[in-house]
Amino acid sequence: MTNWLQKRVRLSPKETALVFEGKEETFEEISEAVKQLAGKLFALGIRKDEMVALLGKNDRMTFLLIHALQQLGAVTLFLNNRLTKKEISFQLANAEVKHVIVADSLVDKVATGISYATLAETDYEAPALLETWDLSRAASVMYTSGTTGKPKGVVQTYENHWWSAVASVLNLGLTEKDSWLCAVPIFHISGLSIMMRSVIYGIPVYLEEHFDEEKITQLLESGKISTISVVTSMLERLLKIHSGSYHPNVRTVLLGGGPASKAVLEICKQRDIPLVQSFGMTETASQIVTLPPKDALNKIGSSGKALFPAEVKIADDGEILLKGPSITPGYLHNKKATEASFVDGWFKTGDIGYLDEEGFLFVLERRSDLIISGGENIYPTEIEHVISEYEGVKEVAVIGKPDDKWGSVPVAFIVAEETFDEAELRLICETNLAGYKIPKQITIVEKLPKTASGKIQRNKLKERHSM
């Protein structure tokens, strides 16, 4: 297939590609900057098919580097800038990285690497840029967030990114006014997929270095934004500071990282906020199941239906299985994990769920998070949904605690509001949950451990509290 950026420049050179810190740049301007960077990377020895790690931020330079590495045909290992030096070191070694490119403010996180400052001082050398891409080639590698066990390197091909973008546009549509606000990390699939969609669709990315709800609200009210990707915690922060709807041009608020609560859904409906819930993974190159706004209140808790042409089914043990061209070919240098993740061509998500009579998917739990108490299956998310309805709770996570009598019992960790009253919460639980599902212990914490994408890391809670 033709090189996406080069093709986009030929199609719409003067259209806006990137808006960062108020400055607009066209696809033509971005392409020229990318070529210059590619020449510098080439001069530093980076070649086609080499594994190159990128440790950056949500900024213009990192944005350009992602494109530059693709132009050279290198495979980009995206490093999470929130990781420790030790965690990063594991990924670099496991991926057998040839080069590391690192933002100046993050150089202490790696033993050695090419800093952005070094790049700026490097002389240009005419690079060998790829005019076409083999869709089966690896474009990127992202290590799983480690919600269970050691992180694994997820290989994402150009075909994976292409079909993810195609599936999304077939579902959400495309207009001349479209633009995508990216306040999620571009080292994560939710952010990188926005960049890929920008080039394939020919729409601008409004890139934000951090999620600032005040600034994001201003952008959503400006008329410049049509789509934004958020996780639940981001959405709740937006709803808290803004009591109305947004500009009519905002047509999609794409929610990932778990379904919204009934309270959030009702607020969005009252305020005419077009919330689109979705389910996706690093292994599926972003969303692969989506629930449109019209079904949100009728299908509370559902992630929706599989996007075209993906398929979803439920295994005999309740595990969600997926099939489609956006799904990873496997894990880097990990044949055992790859083989264990596929059965008859279907990808095993590790999530438990079900399909209702109309084919809507409901994700219940990670298999590893399931609590089995006295032979009863307890799904932490069910308890969390009940607890989160209480206005005194900001955030909640439920895990299983070993118990001599029952094997395991649920316990809750809560980030509380000032109005929190445990007695009131227990009454709510007793009214809405079977006795064995009621948390046997409630612990108030300042914050919950999360991945870069905003998913709560229950395994970290278990480690911290020796459960």
Swiss-Prot record:
EC number: 6.2.1.26
Source organism, top-level taxon: Bacteria
CDD domains named among the record's database cross-references: OSB_CoA_lg
PROSITE patterns assigned: AMP_BINDING (PS00455)
Metabolic or biological pathway: Quinol/quinone metabolism; 1,4-dihydroxy-2-naphthoate biosynthesis; 1,4-dihydroxy-2-naphthoate from chorismate: step 5/7; Quinol/quinone metabolism; menaquinone biosynthesis
Pfam families listed in its UniProt record: AMP-binding (PF00501), AMP-binding_C (PF13193)
Gene Ontology molecular function: ATP binding; medium-chain fatty acid-CoA ligase activity; o-succinylbenzoate-CoA ligase activity
Top EC class, one word: ligase
GO-annotated biological processes: fatty acid metabolic process; menaquinone biosynthetic process
Keywords: ATP-binding, Ligase, Menaquinone biosynthesis, Nucleotide-binding
InterPro entries from the UniProt entry: AMP-bd_C (IPR025110), AMP-bd_C_sf (IPR045851), AMP-binding_CS (IPR020845), AMP-dep_synth/lig_dom (IPR000873), ANL_N_sf (IPR042099), MenE (IPR010192)
Catalytic activity: 2-succinylbenzoate + ATP + CoA = 2-succinylbenzoyl-CoA + AMP + diphosphate
UniProt cross-references to SUPFAM superfamilies, sorted A to Z: Acetyl-CoA synthetase-like
Biological role stated in the UniProt entry: Converts 2-succinylbenzoate (OSB) to 2-succinylbenzoyl-CoA (OSB-CoA).
Family that this chain belongs to: Belongs to the ATP-dependent AMP-binding enzyme family. MenE subfamily.
Name used for this protein in its record: 2-succinylbenzoate--CoA ligase
Organism name: Listeria monocytogenes serotype 4b (strain F2365)
